[in-house]
């Protein structure tokens, strides 16, 4: 499975977990839709779940005039996924994570999602790198 596909499927699983409180294993199975699983895909889903409190704190610290629970579910899932990659995936450059998140926002979010995701993640990336 290509990493871009793994990210899309991880986003679908995380969105489903966030919206419906479905068990992670069930969300993973549903997102895979009969496809063979992938280590990177599972790492993303389980990693975001395991570190969600820390990820949410980082994201919340970079929101201006927003609260995390008021952000669209899909945008919140994209932010969590990207911040997880930036912080916990040493083999992935932060710019790649940021660009992939913007592409996910363009594909799955509304017309303002990509700009919003870019702004939040750019600030987080700057903090991580300093």
UniProtKB/Swiss-Prot annotation:
Record InterPro entries: NusB-like_sf, NusB_fam, NusB_RsmB_TIM44
Similarity remark: Belongs to the NusB family.
Signal peptide interval: none
Physiological role: Involved in transcription antitermination. Required for transcription of ribosomal RNA (rRNA) genes. Binds specifically to the boxA antiterminator sequence of the ribosomal RNA (rrn) operons.
A molecular function (GO) term: RNA binding
Source species, domain of life: Bacteria
Name of the protein in question: Transcription antitermination protein NusB
Pfam family, one: NusB
GO cellular component, one term: cytosol
Keyword annotations: RNA-binding, Transcription, Transcription antitermination, Transcription regulation
GO BP terms: DNA-templated transcription termination; transcription antitermination
């Amino acid at each position: 499975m290509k990493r871009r596909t793994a990210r899309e499927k991880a986003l679908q699983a995380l969105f489903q977990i966030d919206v419906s409180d479905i068990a992670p294993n069930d969300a993973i199975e549903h997102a895979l839709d009969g496809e063979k699983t992938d280590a990177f895909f599972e790492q993303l889903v389980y990693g975001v779940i395991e570190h969600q409190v820390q990820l949410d704190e980082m994201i919340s610290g970079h929101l201006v005039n927003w609260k995390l629970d008021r952000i669209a579910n899909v945008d919140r899932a994209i932010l969590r996924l990207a911040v997880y990659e930036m912080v916990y995936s040493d083999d992935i450059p932060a710019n790649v994570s940021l660009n992939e998140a913007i592409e996910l926002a363009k594909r799955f979010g509304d017309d303002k999602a990509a700009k919003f995701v870019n702004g939040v993640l750019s600030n987080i990336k700057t903090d991580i790198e300093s």
